[in-house]
Regions:
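Charged alpha-helix within mobile-element recombinases
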Residues: 192-282, 330
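Mobile-element integrase/transposase regions
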Residues: 71, 80-135, 139-142, 153-162, ...
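Basic, flexible linker segments flanking DNA-binding modules
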Residues: 11-114, 119-120, 268-273
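Short, solvent-exposed loop/turn segments at secondary-structure boundaries
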Residues: 125, 146-147, 182-187
């Protein structure tokens, strides 16, 4: 019995006592369960998600019912159904969270928290894959999440180029002291830092993992949400896992209420735009774009006028012993440029070796 129903009966009983009808008072009937039975399609999906190893959480099941079947319910209803059908997962006790005030940016695009998390994401695979994840600090809009075989420079280039082309460029990224981002020489950039600097994106460094707690909690969200879904759907390859991520990401932004904001990240994003609290910059067309987001190395042209390409040597339109820039793209394409990226000049491609 719900608490509201209890107080309704209690008030009715006190009124009967005041009217001298306490001996004949009876609580009456509630009218029974007014909720319709769930369809076989709904119960089949719940059973599939709760029976997977590891099982999905109740909130994840409710979210998947909405995303896949357009059936709206809450986690409490899923929990009651799971207990009644002996499908409730054995989860550890969680203490009540204490309210904490957290600093956050005012404007959308002022600061994006960015991090990587290695984990055994694919079911039945002992090797760990890496999830690159990025989150707007002001609105909690999860602007990107993608799985890669390992955390490499090319993985970072591929991910950030995708996100910036879709959502625009922020003013700064909040990162850790990983060697991809940080160099001990304050006047020098890493290759990734140089690419971000080329497009006016600053790097701010978190002193501890707790300092970038928003993105760390998002990692925990994906580990609890994505791993059970991949196991339930028997997705064992990165291509299928990223296709599922591409569906889960907008659904979570648009339909799942953030506990700290009291609204969905999409609603917070739209509110920031309406209040003109956005400093995001669109990714303007730039001839240097494919070369900036590539792994660059300096190569000297041989006396024979050739440069190494794999186990072969190719002629190049540059004088012998000249230094050229070798650009390896995330998709495997290889370019040789006469000069390093310079916003005041245009790229001069000397050789292009496409991936086969």
């Amino acid at each position: 019995m719900a608490r509201a129903r209890f107080y309704e009966l209690y008030s009715d009983y006190l009124l009967a006592c005041a009217q001298g009808r306490s001996e004949t008072w009876s609580p009456g009937r509630s009218g029974g369960d007014h909720h319709p039975d769930w369809s076989a399609e709904v119960t089949a999906l719940i059973t599939k998600l709760l029976a997977s190893k590891p099982p999905s959480s109740y909130s994840a099941v409710a979210s998947e019912l909405h995303r896949r079947l357009h059936f709206k319910t809450d986690r409490a209803s899923v929990r009651r159904w799971a207990i009644a059908h002996q499908l409730n997962p054995d989860t550890r006790y969680k203490p009540v969270r204490k309210p904490v005030k957290r600093w956050q940016a005012r404007d959308y695009g002022a600061l994006w928290q960015y991090d990587a998390t290695p984990h055994a994401w694919l079911p039945g695979c002992s090797d760990k894959q890496v999830l690159l994840d990025i989150l707007d600090d002001a609105t909690r809009l999860n602007t990107g999440a993608r799985l890669y075989p390992a955390e490499t420079l090319l993985a970072h280039f591929d991910f950030l180029a995708r996100v910036f082309q879709t959502h625009g460029q922020p003013l700064a990224l909040y990162v850790d002291y990983h060697s991809f981002f940080y160099t001990h020489n304050p006047d020098a950039f890493t290759q990734l830092g140089a690419a971000l600097h080329f497009y006016g994106v600053k790097l701010l460094y978190a002193p501890t993992p707790q300092a970038k707690g928003k993105i760390e909690r998002r990692h925990d969200y994906w580990q609890k949400r994505l791993v059970p879904l991949l196991a339930a759907d028997h997705i064992i390859e990165l291509v299928g896992a990223n296709q599922l991520l591409d569906q889960l990401l907008p659904h979570g932004n648009q339909h799942e209420i953030h506990r700290e904001l009291g609204q969905t990240p999409h609603a917070a994003h739209q509110q920031a735009l309406a209040e003109k609290r956005s400093v995001i910059r669109p990714a303007a067309p730039c001839p240097w774009w494919p070369y900036v987001w590539s792994q660059q190395t300096r190569v000297r042209v041989g006396d024979d006028g050739k440069v190494p390409v794999g186990d072969q040597r190719h002629f190049i339109a540059a004088p012998p012993r000249a230094t050229v820039i070798r650009c390896l793209r995330p998709d495997g394409d290889l370019y040789y440029l006469r000069h390093a990226p310079d916003p005041k000049a245009k790229p001069l491609v000397l050789l292009h070796v496409p991936v086969f």
